[in-house]
């Protein structure tokens, strides 16, 4: 794997949060050791308010086990 699990999670979270948001908090929880090549990253928005966006992401290995999960809070920035 060319990038770390944390970097993959952060990139996916930034994608769902959008360019108008800035990270306020990022928490990463790692699963048990295992082969991470070919892992799938998925991110989604849990909740959004006028000023904050709450998002989750996970990396799952090919066999379906959880490699890492993340939760983040983004602050919306006025353009």
Task: Describe each region flagged by the PLM.
Residues 1-79:
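Terminal targeting signals and extreme-terminal segments of soluble enzymes
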């Amino acid at each position: 794997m060319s990038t770390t699990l944390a970097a993959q999670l952060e990139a996916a979270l930034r994608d769902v949060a959008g360019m108008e948001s800035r990270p306020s908090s990022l928490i990463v929880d790692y699963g048990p050791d295992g082969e991470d090549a070919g892992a799938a990253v998925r991110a989604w928005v849990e909740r959004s308010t006028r000023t904050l966006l709450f998002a989750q992401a996970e990396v799952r290995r090919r066999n379906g086990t959880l490699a890492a999960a993340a939760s983040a809070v983004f602050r919306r920035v006025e353009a």
